[in-house]
Structure formats: C-alpha cells, structure tokens
Amino acid sequence: MKKFVALALISLCLSSCNLIFNRYKHSAPKPEVYFPDGLELQMATAIYNDKPRAIRKLIKEGVDLNHVSKGGMTYLYYALLNHNYDVMELLLKHGADPNIHSEFYTNPEYHKRGYSDDQTDATCLEYASHKYFDIKYMKLLIKYGANVNDTTSIGPIWGALRDESHGREKLKYLVEQGLNLNYSQTGTPAICGQALIYEWDMVLFLMDLGADPLA
C-alpha cells in the first residue's frame, strides 16, 4: 500500500511540473515570420511541424545548420522556441553551434512598417535559463558546448534568477559548469543586484555558491 501511495505522489509531482512548464510555454511564431523563403523556410517548417525525417534529409543535402535567417534567427534557437528537445539534440549532434547569437525583432511586421519594436539579441543558453524551460534544455546546450561565461551576451544567470520555481537548481548547475557569479556586463554582479531589491534569501544562496559581495 505504501508503495502505491509513493508512486501516486511521484506521478502527481511529475504532472504538476508539466503543468507549470505548459503554463509558461510560449507559442512559437510560424516559420515564415523569421524564415521567409527558400531553404531556410523548408528547414524551419520541418522544425515547427516536428518532422525529424525531413530535417535529416535537409542535413544530408548540406543545409547550413548555423545559418542565421533573414529574420535573424538560428534553427537551433527556433527549435528551442518550439520546446522541441529532440530536434535540438538532432541539430546539435550534427554540428549546430549553441553560441551563435540570434538577433531578431519581436514583431518583424511592425518593424517593416516603421513602428518601434524591441530587438532581441540572445544565445540559446540565455533563453533556456528562463522559467519557461525545464533545466534539461540548459544541460543539453552545455553538453554540446554552450558557453556559460559568454561575455558577448546576457548571461544565463539573469533568467535563472527570475525562475522562482527552478531557478536555484539552475544556478547551482551553472556554477557546477564553471559559471563566474561575479561577472556582469553592466558592472553590477548578480549578488549586488539581488541585494538592491532586498532578496536576502537569494543573496545568501549566491554567497553559498561562491559569489563575492565585494567583487
């Protein structure tokens, strides 16, 4: 009976985790938004529709997996937007570089019409650190060479800090992979930023991980 109850509780916990991630899951834009035509549209469509056979065929035909589309996005980043772990792994196994920046407008059509629009400049690891993603995405990217200390991009630490459910797990893992907690592009290390907003529990947690409040 105890075994049955334990299994039921484990199942409930797993279901709850899935609900949390589904709640925050972004609907990926349709392929043509960032991959308007040609071979890049074919590849993005295969990713969007989760067609690994079509993706393998295009890889075999020589598609450049590190191509940045006319809309400013890599195939790997687009697979991440689709929450497609298996496709990401397929791309990485065949040479996709997780450290290439994607630089794209939030709404390209608005930008084309002359309206003001935010431009994103990010790597896959930075985006995978956010609350929308299970830690397995970060682990996959790091396994295939994602740089936890990339100084050309906003670091993954900032997304992890905003993840109230799994942020600490992500931060601990990043530190285990060599993350420099004391570096910041803005000059304000994460621990100081958390102190400024009175997040003392997080300050103590970062200190336990090795962050230096005097850095």
Spell out what each predicted region is:
Residues A6-L9:
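Sec-dependent N-terminal signal peptides
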Residues Y24-G71:
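N-terminal segments that cap or nucleate solenoid repeat domains
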Residues D50, H83, Y132-F133, E164-H166, ...:
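Ankyrin-repeat intra-repeat helix-capping/turn positions
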